[in-house]
């Protein structure tokens, strides 16, 4: 699947779209703001002319001639008017304008440069407001400015925005009110749709390679994995896996992603998936991990993890089905071929190593083979004791000791034997 073909990241969720339609229908009486000296005559005159331009051609002509005035008016209105309904209206107009033509972000960059500001500096403070619609429209505009503009968001602004995204995704329960201010509550359904809006902002940001590195540095992968492990709805699931797919377009990111249990988590979701779009994005993510990795060892590690998680069997089952989307069939064919090649080169120790790294060991015959351990025990020390460190991280010693009281006699026996050998080894070291 090509990155250019994935266009739904900027599409608003149902609740955002419905509220935006409601906001557009409630026209603002700009004349009353002018009479109350809350806005200037210049801004009042321009916003009224802007509203009168119905066709895209008329609007484009106005923006080409008076782009600077447009940015100035929108920002003045947004910062000087406190009424929430009017702020919502202004943000919706800005979002619509940018969505119609992505290049229009330049009018905000040009205006900001004159005041030695950044284009998003006017919108970032709005992330702290109470109204959910206002907050998320501002978040969408920030993402569009950052993703579609010629200048990159950097430093404290980018850290602030990414931390806000992480907080929203991690909580999945956004505070504030939207429309139903009388009750002071937001339904679970509404809340989940706002989280999807946040995920959409992340999807848009991660299309830009530089932002992928910044997201990873902000510990963003842990945030994504946390959401996926939290049994979220299929739409948010899709968006988080979409984000992994975007990250995996970068070879360096493929290297970094080895630290996380991505393959087992996606494998579990694939097995339970009933939505074709979720299946499609998982297969595309798997393909990127194998195809974009430049290091042979990295590709091999991902392939082994997929084999260990029984992805081959799932692919064979999926291959029997018919799909409208050609990308799915192509990705299945690619993965079957690559994993088939890896199976040929797979040694028993490779399989054991892959199982251990995934935290999913299976009691297969090879694990009980004395010959296997005589030949391979020393290999646990390879790569600066990499596998021994994994065992330590998994709490291997404590797990073995827990099994000394296991109901199965064979398990108890092996656990006692292992603990005995550990103690003997420690005594010998002390001597």
Predicted segments, located by residue:
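Buried hydrophobic core positions in alpha-solenoid tandem helical repeats
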Residues: 73-76, 108, 119-125, 161-169, ...
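Short sequence/structural elements of tandem HEAT/ARM alpha-solenoid repeats
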Residues: 64-72, 106-118, 154-163, 213-219, ...
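Alpha-helical solenoid repeats of the armadillo/HEAT superfamily
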Residues: 35-48, 82-99, 128-147, 158, ...
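Conserved blade-ending motifs and adjacent loop-strand segments that build the rim/top face
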Residues: 312-323, 404-406
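N-terminal "cap/leader" segments of large eukaryotic alpha-helical scaffolds
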Residues: 1-86, 99, 333-387
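Extended amphipathic alpha-helical scaffolding regions
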Residues: 74-78, 94, 123-124, 158-166, ...
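Eukaryotic helix-linker segments that join adjacent hydrophobic helices
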Residues: 57-144
